[in-house]
Design a protein with these regions (language model features):
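N-terminal, polar/charged subdomain of small-to-medium soluble alpha/beta proteins
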Residues: 1-137
């Protein structure tokens, strides 16, 4: 387990990942679907062995995208909070070297009487070894 005081930390950010899915409370949302936008930020400490230019030392952002896309297209959620939680749990299971995950899930087309640009939910998870000072930034 890496030391929380390690001097190096890699951050991976995927911004504005767009997908069409059928999440939401309303029957129309289940039938028609809509666009969702996701921002992902995750971090890990590098391995203690000497760094090489190999994918095994990092987390593939292509695989991160694929895991998120697969989950969003194969399951239906009524709540953005439930979808955000499922994404975090999937990424924790598939990428055990991740020590910090932040998911911000945007729903641009909100079926409300009020005028707004979007609704969004953010969920942050950090391992017990993750420094608290970094988790709140």
């Amino acid at each position: 387990m890496p030391s929380p005081t390690a001097s190096k930390c890699f951050w991976i950010r995927l911004q504005q990942l767009r997908f069409h899915a059928h999440h939401g409370l309303l029957p129309e949302e289940a039938t028609l679907g809509q666009r969702f936008v996701l921002d992902l930020e995750c971090a890990y400490h590098p391995p203690s062995e000497p760094w090489t230019d190999e994918l095994s030392h990092t987390v593939s952002y292509a695989e991160l995208c694929e895991q998120i896309r697969e989950l969003c297209e194969q399951r239906r959620f009524k709540l953005l909070e439930s979808l955000a939680d499922a994404i975090v749990e999937r990424l924790r299971a598939e990428f055990p070297k991740l020590e910090y995950i932040r998911v911000c899930l945007h729903k641009p087309s909100v079926p409300l009487a009020a005028l707004l640009d979007e609704a969004a939910v953010e969920l942050r998870w950090c391992s017990e070894t993750w420094p608290n000072s970094l988790a709140s930034s």
